[in-house]
Amino acid sequence: MKNLFKVALLVVSFATLSFITAEKKEINIVIDAGHGGHDLGATHEEALEKSIVVEVTKKIQSLNTDADIKIHVTRTEDHFLSLQERANFINKIKPDLVISLHTNSNKNSTTTGIETFYSDKSIAALKSEEMANKLSEVIAKNIPLNNRGVKKAPFWILSKSEVPAVIVEMGFISNQNDKDYLTNEKGQNEIAKTILEFIEGLK
């Protein structure tokens, strides 16, 4: 009887361990820091899009402490990458999701807020739309800027990525309030933590 009990206990323990192991899921994410090098992106006064996005990218990478979340980045330095080079990088890794970071600008300085984009031209359009909506919800909850919601656009990096991909336009540097937030350490940290919270929720 004792031996039978030991066998039963071993079977239960193995089944429990197998369940826990099955539940663990490693995910791969590409964070694409837009522009770089001679490509400044949007500019306003001293604010440069290429610099803001790379700072947020590095913060996402450094804040991640989950061994099951692999963060791959297109750049952490100020150098130029063509759209084709970015797409090649993404399609070689084949991540679960691409999040491309950008900032916006408008001639009307009162235009403000964060926009999340996906492309219906992508082979992963449905999943991209789903991811864009989920990310936008987390952004609306955590970031104290106007949330302009999810939009559809045939941006090259979204259309040419063979995996789900979204663009986050993190705010308008042509708007003083948005610019102050985006160029501030606290604001950049909040955005990085928000994106990481969303990524953690994908597990």
Regions from the PLM with identified roles:
Residues 4-8, 12-26:
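Bacterial Sec-dependent signal peptides at the C-terminal "C-region" and cleavage site
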Residues 23-133, 141:
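Catalytic-core regions of hydrolytic enzymes
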Residues 30, 41, 72, 100, ...:
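Active-site-adjacent mobile loop/cap segments within catalytic or ligand-binding domains
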Residues 63, 138, 198, 202:
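Short alpha-helical functional segments enriched in proximate histidine and acidic residues
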Residues 141-147:
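Short secondary-structure junctions
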